[in-house]
């Protein structure tokens, strides 16, 4: 082959190898960049989820804020500016109330006496505590009356249990003017009595304007349609997964997260209104709650009530008893010697009488009035 031809072939081969090397270099560079990004992302995730320290969470959901973060939390200036003078004052009062409650370490766990009360009375062990300072009153344990125009709320005496999968209760709006704002939900204790549920930490509520609030002192988020007089609002609590849902006239709404702390049924209002709470003492509007028995406790307690000592018992006449016993004496009894003459007289010290069992009955005793004592005639005894 001619040398010129050989030179041309070599030039063609070298020109063909240069593009291949460039493509190979590009692939190697891309692979290196991808590996570097993966390593960097792995390091970031490793540092984020393995680093020890205090976790600071926002107040988006109940229970997602620790006590130290609550103390160090800064006021949302933008939301605070949207409040009126009364709202700003209430917000600052509620914040001070929460900080004082956090420092006092109030124990809200259910006590043994509470469990015994639930076993004995069933669902009737729950009742709402009146808030008379803000003109909030309770009738028949579950009929709530808000008489003032101030913001206030009422809570039950016992928290919801954590044994069953779901606990449910309903609130019927009996008399609610148009300009009254009602908030129904769950909250922890101690909770500011001058605030609605959902406005402060560790509380969630469905508001009558159609919004829902979870630790939202400034604004609420759209949730469902508004409710008014005649509607029935239900609250369902799932303690196993810390979730809460609401119902409106028997129709279920979306679920929301809630805190792991002890929660109490809480109802609040701004303005006069009358509400009735069904904790399970009657049937629900929500059919599923009736079928699955989601009431707070059995309608009837499992323990028998103690005997009543206040009722008066029938008077026992010992004269009639002695006469009947004397009439049934046998012939053998009449032949026995008479020992009544040797019987000692009844013991009586300072007007105090003793019965056969040794029980004391003073003249001023209430038992003496219920069980009148009579002198027993002498009879033949062995």
UniProtKB/Swiss-Prot annotation:
Residue span of region Disordered: 304-382
Matches recorded under Gene3D superfamilies: 2.60.120.920
GO biological process, one term: protein transport to vacuole involved in ubiquitin-dependent protein catabolic process via the multivesicular body sorting pathway
Lineage: Eukaryota, Fungi, Dikarya, Ascomycota, Taphrinomycotina
Keyword annotations: Cytoplasm, Membrane, Transmembrane, Transmembrane helix
GO cellular component, one term: cytoplasm
PROSITE patterns (alphabetical): B302_SPRY
Top-level taxonomic group: Eukaryota
This protein's name: SPRY domain-containing protein C285.10c
Species for this entry: Schizosaccharomyces pombe (strain 972 / ATCC 24843) (Fission yeast)
Bias (Polar residues) ranges: 309-334, 361-372
Domain B30.2/SPRY: 79-284
Membrane-spanning ranges: 21-41
Membrane-protein topology: Single-pass membrane protein
Primary site of residence: cytoplasm
Subcellular location: Cytoplasm; Membrane
